[in-house]
Amino acid sequence: MKYESSFKSEADGLEISVMALIPDKKPYRAVVQLVHGMSEHKERYIPFMQYLAKLGYVVVIHDHRGHGKSVKHQDDLGFTYGGGAQAMLQDIRTVNRKIHAYYPELPLILMGHSMGSLAVRAFVAEHDSCVDMLIVCGSPSYNTAMPLGVAIAKTETACLLYTS
């Protein structure tokens, strides 16, 4: 069963959109709290959430501020309303607390993808007792080949400008 709701962010009162998929049958195995990446939204994860729910996991995800439905206006996509990373971490904490309130007996698995992987690492650094398992995937990192890519891009740009 799919539930959608929202809560007012403790950081600044912004409405944060949340979705949960609940398995049809009990007992539930655990709760998976998903934390999405930059320029994503919670609906992108529905097929993955359905898969986990079929395996017996309760799955909860929220749209980060400035993403999906966690905006005041569609033109605001990408803007965090001044709250920045600290407000995003506070929103993750609010969702985490609500999960613990609804499912105190279940283990909580926190999973972050891409920008979400950076967020969950920062979250766990301060709130490790709130998580039973951490899954970090698609973490951004420095690519040693980046200077070569930048040089190629500059060369191609120069060639395009020269031939125009």
Annotate each predicted stretch with a short phrase.
Residues 1-23:
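N-terminal cap/lid segment of alpha/beta-hydrolase-fold proteins
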Residues 37-40:
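Active-site glycine-rich loops that stabilize anionic/oxyanionic intermediates
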Residues 53-73:
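Conserved alpha/beta-hydrolase
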Residues 81-100:
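Alpha/beta-hydrolase active-site loop
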Residues 103-113:
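Alpha/beta-hydrolase fold nucleophile elbow
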Residues 117-128:
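Short glycine-enriched nucleophile-adjacent loop
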Residues 135-144:
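Active-site nucleophile loop of the alpha/beta-hydrolase fold
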Residues 162-163:
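Conserved small/polar residues in nucleotide/adenosyl-binding loops
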